[in-house]
Amino acid sequence: MAQADIALIGLAVMGQNLILNMNDHGFVVCAFNRTVSKVDDFLANEAKGTKVLGAHSLEEMVSKLKKPRRIILLVKAGQAVDNFIEKLVPLLDIGDIIIDGGNSEYRDTMRRCRDLKDKGILFVGSGVSGGEDGARYGPSLMPGGNKEAWPHIKAIFQGIAAKVGTGEPCCDWVGDDGAGHFVKMVHNGIEYGDMQLICEAYHLMKDVLGLGHKEMAKAFEEWNKTELDSFLIEITASILKFQDADGKHLLPKIRDSAGQKGTGKWTAISALEYGVPVTLIGEAVFARCLSSLKDERIQASKKLKGPQNIPFEGDKKSFLEDIRKALYASKIISYAQGFMLLRQAATEFGWTLNYGGIALMWRGGCIIRSVFLGKIKDAFDRNPGLQNLLLDDFFKSAVENCQDSWRRAISTGVQAGIPMPCFTTALSFYDGYRHAMLPANLIQAQRDYFGAHTYELLAKPGQFIHTNWTGHGGSVSSSSYNA
């Protein structure tokens, strides 16, 4: 007998927690896992005493679902998703819904939407953020795909999502085909940027100011009462205070080689593909790559010299405020770049994205949740067509207020030999963006010189000219060089 509102396939911790979250909100869920013994274990333990149902086969699972059938896949991205879709399609009817809640590549989601539409199945690719805790008590959800599915899943998705303000859910329809997974990808890229910016602030505190863990933890706790109020700042303070079983701080014992699952890399690759200067996320990815060269760095540290270590002689409290403002200004740049990429993707794929709504989706439940995102929503509410966050009066004033501190923090760090790839690229982007004239005219002249690629004159836009720079050779454009 059909009695379940929705099914979920994939009983790793995220899947289990999403099921329990849906159960808490009054939805009857049918659980399935490829290893069916996991279903029995889940029902006997974590889901004991709940209304959660189990199934030992896909056929049994489908038979227990009310129509239109709603099925969430929470399995490893890639072939596993396609394999389950292939098995499910023969069991489903026209109008049934498959939802991929994994970290799928947005192009895969676009393909699946297209293929399943031809079969009459509604496909949704939804970003899910917030980790295991978010899944259990309120994630940020970013659904996109076939919009016909939205009325049938809206109550469930908005019911289980994190809530902010006066109970607004951190979930709304994002857009067509791959839009939900694209937005989740950019979210993850921004997360890389936020984490690296915090690391650079920590590095300046530790190696320029010489602060101890208690002092650094206190600084981050204070910062969490300012514009920087966020989940990542909050946990950084906790990490800095945490002591191991021997009573010593744990952080210095952790190997300084950062891992990555690839979603930050996807964001950087997309930025290159669509010609958007998302420099900060790119540098955050490369910083992790550099950190992974631990053995090489140990050897290099014995051979390569930097500036002499001179104790900081300035006002520590004042420089700490410079670091805070540098972090805030750089964070603004990171989000401005992220939303530039979203805007370009919307143009490329014909998506209608609600940028203020996206900021609200990220306002709670996810790893980058922060008060700051409310300001981004306000900016897009004031001007839905806003070209760049930096052009909004609030963010323009915020960066201006931070600018002197930003430059001082970076110049002091450079003089001390501290690597700050994200602080420095953020400032370089800001300076580049505010320059009406950049030296790219020389690049165009060079390209024309060696490859006859032509150039435009400021006085004659739209007319492409080739100059015979050496007096030798013809004036025909060449395709021999593509620099």
Curated annotation (Swiss-Prot):
Catalytic activity: 6-phospho-D-gluconate + NADP(+) = D-ribulose 5-phosphate + CO2 + NADPH
EC number: 1.1.1.44
GO molecular function, a single term: phosphogluconate dehydrogenase (decarboxylating) activity
Amino-acid positions noted as binding substrate in the UniProt annotation, renumbered to this chain: 103, 129, 131, 187-188, 192, 261, 288, 447, 453
Pathway in which the depicted protein is active: Carbohydrate degradation; pentose phosphate pathway; D-ribulose 5-phosphate from D-glucose 6-phosphate (oxidative stage): step 3/3
GO biological process: D-gluconate metabolic process; pentose-phosphate shunt
Annotated Pfam families: 6PGD, NAD_binding_2
GO cellular component: cytoplasm
UniProt-annotated catalytic positions: 184 (proton acceptor), 191 (proton donor)
SUPFAM superfamilies: 6-phosphogluconate dehydrogenase C-terminal domain-like (SSF48179), NAD(P)-binding Rossmann-fold domains (SSF51735)
Superkingdom field: Eukaryota
Positions with a binding annotation for NADP(+): 10-15, 33-35, 75-77, 103, 478-481
Keyword terms, alphabetized: Acetylation, Cytoplasm, Gluconate utilization, NADP, Oxidoreductase, Pentose shunt, Phosphoprotein
Cellular location(s): Cytoplasm
Its job: Catalyzes the oxidative decarboxylation of 6-phosphogluconate to ribulose 5-phosphate and CO(2), with concomitant reduction of NADP to NADPH.
Family named by the database record: Belongs to the 6-phosphogluconate dehydrogenase family.
Record's protein name: 6-phosphogluconate dehydrogenase, decarboxylating
Lineage: Eukaryota, Metazoa, Chordata, Craniata, Vertebrata
